[in-house]
Swiss-Prot record:
It catalyses: a di-trans,poly-cis-dolichyl diphosphate + H2O = a di-trans,poly-cis-dolichyl phosphate + phosphate + H(+). It is found in: Endoplasmic reticulum membrane. It comes from Mus musculus (Mouse). Its main location: endoplasmic reticulum. This is Dolichyldiphosphatase 1.
Length: 238
């Protein structure tokens, strides 16, 4: 304990770089882009929330692909060892290497995989209404726009060069295509067997890969069950 009126500081302090983003003071665009560059964290939190409450195998597989994608990014960075932009103002970064950009690779993996899922995996809904198709197009455009803006933010905020975010986007897109093929051709046929494992049944892990529109399915099943219980309750009260 330091004596009253005296201050003692540790030898050094380090920030948590996972959420540490700097932007030029007074720059509104930089401020907004700094928040946008945190999108990968929001995506991961969203996935964890979905897995906890839905416990669906495809969602778990998607998150596993994102984790693998980040592992590949780390490996490439430490093989190429290209530094971040010269003269950059940032000292608190996760790694001194910048090729390829992990933010760009993450967001392009997420966006391209989601794009493929929306247009190839959900093709089974042949009777899709106009609003369903419009929603799919708008969502896809939003995902691709978000990936571009996050990539741009890393250049604007001087964390990466254009080439680093470009190759990050290319790597993420290629990884997304490869993981989508692996999921569809190898993992999806195994999902029913995995869902039947005792440990999966214990944790209520489920497989919805054969249901083209899970949201509509859950809505109709829940509504039917609620009406059935309401009828039973009404019968008991009579």
């Amino acid at each position: 304990m330091a004596a009253d009126g005296q201050c003692s500081l540790p030898a050094s302090w380090r920030p948590v770089t996972l959420t540490h983003v700097e932007y030029p003071a007074g720059d509104l665009s930089g401020h907004l882009l700094a928040y946008l560059s945190l999108s990968p964290i929001f995506v991961v939190v969203g996935f964890l929330t979905l897995i906890i409450f839905k416990r669906e195998l495809h969602t778990i597989s998607f998150l596993g692909g994102l984790a693998l994608n980040q592992g590949v990014n780390w490996l490439i960075k430490h093989v190429i060892q290209e530094p971040r932009p010269c003269g950059g103002p940032h000292t608190a970064v996760g790694t001194k290497y910048g090729m390829p950009s992990s933010h760009s690779q993450f967001m392009w993996f997420f966006s391209v995989y989601s794009f493929l899922f929306l247009y190839l995996r959900m093709h089974q809904t042949n009777n899709a209404r106009f609003l369903d198709l419009l929603w799919r197009h708008v969502l896809s455009l939003g995902l691709l726009t978000a990936a571009f803006l996050v990539s741009y933010s890393r250049v604007y905020l001087l964390y990466h060069t254009w080439s680093q975010v470009f190759y990050g986007g290319v790597a993420g897109s290629l990884m997304a295509v490869a993981w989508f093929i692996i999921t569809q051709e190898i993992l999806t046929p195994l999902f029913p067997r995995i869902a039947a494992w005792p440990i999966s049944e214990f944790f209520l892990i489920r497989d919805t890969s054969l249901i083209p529109n899970v949201l509509w399915f859950e809505y109709t099943v829940t509504r039917a069950e609620a009406r059935n219980r309401q009828r039973k309750l009404g019968t008991k009260l009579q």
